[in-house]
């Protein structure tokens, strides 16, 4: 008659022990890891560094020595790097001690660049041009809102990018005073723990094509009714695959 009572602690011990199984722990740890390269040193700029050609950061961590101000809008003076039209930034880590990350004033290439903690935005694509912006490799995490903010026109190519714990990976500006038709092509993305992967303004003819994997991302592609009134917020129209949001649902899990 005492056997069930004796077995109960053993069953409870077994049940609570399962989450600590080394194979399960390894699986969870692997899924949650952020594959940022090891830093080769740190550099703090007193003002933004302007790049007009190619800058190889040598996998050092770059910052401004300031505290993030959250979603308070900053300006060019708060950026770590400002890229002139046609410039390239590669092999760099953007630290947490900054506000505006990287600004591109025209077409630019961002290759193997990592953001340890995004502040207002990680990358802002500015200017009035209609060229091509390339983001190849690299990654970003801990973005309360946007990772890539696309204010200019043209095309954005995002290839083999890792993003974790974010609001949106890409957002076409919803209320810029000057609006454009914008295109984003995403391939090989690895996304986890996000609100939306992409936000576009379909009323301006924006399109997004998306391939990759996503885990715990609430929405993949959201269409908005954009406006050129900077004092108004764009209205959400729809979410999911369409002639503007081009992808197959569901994306595979990472």
From Swiss-Prot:
Cofactor requirement: Ca(2+)
Bias (Low complexity): 239-254
Show the SUPFAM superfamilies listed in the entry. Pectin lyase-like
The molecular function terms of the Gene Ontology recorded here are: pectate lyase activity
One GO term of the biological process aspect: pectin catabolic process
A cellular-component GO term for this protein: extracellular region
> What Gene3D superfamilies does the entry give?
Single-stranded right-handed beta-helix, Pectin lyase-like
User: EC number(s) of the enzyme?
Assistant: 4.2.2.2
Q: How does activity depend on temperature?
A: Optimum temperature is 37 degrees Celsius.
Q: Which reaction does it catalyse?
A: Eliminative cleavage of (1->4)-alpha-D-galacturonan to give oligosaccharides with 4-deoxy-alpha-D-galact-4-enuronosyl groups at their non-reducing ends
Q: What keywords were assigned to this record?
A: Calcium, Carbohydrate metabolism, Cell wall biogenesis/degradation, Glycoprotein, Lyase, Polysaccharide degradation, Secreted, Signal
Q: Give me the segments passing through the membrane.
A: none
Q: Where is this region: Disordered?
A: 227-254
Where found in the cell?
Secreted
Q: What class of enzyme is it?
A: lyase
Where would I find glycosylation on this chain?
229
Q: Cofactor comment in the record? A: Binds 1 Ca(2+) ion per subunit.
Signal sequence segment: 1-17
UniProt cross-references to Pfam families, sorted A to Z: Pectate_lyase
Question: What function does the entry list?
Answer: Pectinolytic enzyme consist of four classes of enzymes: pectin lyase, polygalacturonase, pectin methylesterase and rhamnogalacturonase. Among pectinolytic enzymes, pectin lyase is the most important in depolymerization of pectin, since it cleaves internal glycosidic bonds of highly methylated pectins. Favors pectate, the anion, over pectin, the methyl ester.
Q: What is this protein called?
A: Pectate lyase E
The organism's taxonomy opens as: Eukaryota, Fungi, Dikarya, Ascomycota, Pezizomycotina
Q: Which gene encodes it?
A: plyE
